[in-house]
Amino acid sequence: FPRLEERQHQVASTLSGGEQQMLAIGRGLMSRPKLLLLDEPSMGLAPLLVKEIFNIVKAINQQGTTILLVEQNANMALSIADYGYVLETGRTVLHGPAQELAANEEVKAAYLGG
């Protein structure tokens, strides 16, 4: 997280939303977990920062950490996921490989704006 290195002496509460998300992810990685749980990492972020956060999440996964991602931005989540679950009122209504879910007409119509 090069951006955080530049701000290493800054109080966390004064960081931008994206920087705070990077800090939270970094703190979660400090114990070298096998599984990292992320709840809405894109919430409240500008689109450019959302893309950056998702690139970071993808890189963490590619380095061997399993990621459980809860995310309203279904397009972005499915673009980096291996597998996905679609929940409605707390129940799993669909699941499968992320590419299949992204191509599913029901999923497109209901969740992907298409």
Say what each PLM segment does.
Residues 25, 45:
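Hydrophobic anchor residue at the start of the ABC signature
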Residues 28-29:
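ABC ATPase C-loop
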Residues 51-63:
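Helical segment within the ABC ATPase nucleotide-binding domain
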